[in-house]
From Swiss-Prot:
CDD domains: ThiG (cd04728). 1-deoxy-D-xylulose 5-phosphate binds at G158, A185, G186, N207, T208. The gene is thiG. Residues 243-262 are annotated as: Disordered. GO terms for molecular function: thiazole synthase activity. PANTHER family: THIAZOLE SYNTHASE. This is Thiazole synthase. It is an enzyme of class 2 (transferase). Pathway: Cofactor biosynthesis; thiamine diphosphate biosynthesis.
């Protein structure tokens, strides 16, 4: 179970709704993955090039999954705040995935503006989930601003590279043990999702890895299983890696010629 802002969700997977081949494939993918939330933007085109209209909203409602609006495409504090306020009116929710991009090539979050926008939105009653980097200090500033959960990237959006800064992500997990951390952006394979879940991250948000795959419906299922498996492995307590071999079978009753004295 995933807990965010005192609200509990049955899944640790969050799924984006952009760039699917057709609305029907999107709907099937959501139903297959059974995510905790589905993200949607007011500023992006819908499936098949259609604008976000009543039909797209109806499709999202049919899934029965809570909607997490985002501020994708925003590059200033005022732009992000205005978009969040509009999203609250349209989708009737206080949840917002706060995105504030600082570089058009890498789509890296502008953490300075992100903190400022988060402070404003939290004071306005929003439940803010900020898309951020794995920088520990920036993440602390977001927590100081009132955020109760964070969404650090694994790699730049849409790259599918997996966790490129594994050390920094593990440090972040270790130093913020009580903060829900959801890996957002850069995952391309179910194995990569399982890996970060094994490290103790609380959830994963995906879009491109599913929507642009050869079979989004089956890929959605693969990621859902990977996230669940990774979490189970973390909770089970994996064995530590060793440099020296260690037999797994008992040595009681072994032949005398195997003894050290022989």
């Amino acid at each position: 179970m995933l807990t965010l802002y005192s609200e509990t969700f049955p899944s640790r997977l969050l799924l984006g709704t952009a760039a699917y081949p057709t609305p029907e494939i999107l709907k099937q993918s959501v139903r297959t993955a059974r995510p905790a939330m589905i993200t949607v933007s007011l500023r992006r085109a819908g499936c098949g090039g259609e604008a976000h209209g009543q039909g797209f909203w109806s499709l999202l409602q049919e899934t029965g999954v809570p909607v997490l609006p985002n501020t994708a495409g925003c590059q200033s504090v005022q732009e992000a705040v205005t978009t969040a306020q509009m999203a609250r009116e349209v989708f009737e929710t206080d949840w917002i995935k706060l995105e504030l991009i600082g570089d058009d090539d890498t789509l890296q979050p502008d953490v300075f503006q992100l903190v400022e926008a988060a402070e404003i939105l939290i004071k306005d009653g929003f439940k803010v989930l900020p898309y951020c980097t794995e920088d520990l200090i920036a993440c602390r500033r977001l927590l100081d601003a009132g955020c109760q959960a964070l969404m650090p990237w694994a790699a730049p959006i849409g790259t599918g590279l997996g966790a490129v800064h594994a050390y920094a992500l593990n440090v972040l997990r270790e130093r913020l043990p009580d903060t829900p951390l959801i890996i957002d952006a850069g995952l391309g394979l179910p194995s990569q999702a399982a890996q970060v879940m094994e490290w103790g991250f609380d959830g994963v948000l995906l879009n491109t890895a599913v929507s642009r795959s050869g079979d989004p419906v089956n890929m959605a299922r693969a990621f859902a299983l990977a996230v669940e498996s990774g979490r189970l492995a973390f909770e089970a307590g994996p064995v530590e890696a060793r440099d020296k071999a260690q037999a797994s079978t008992p040595t009681v009753g072994q032949p005398f010629w195997h003894s050290a004295e022989y």
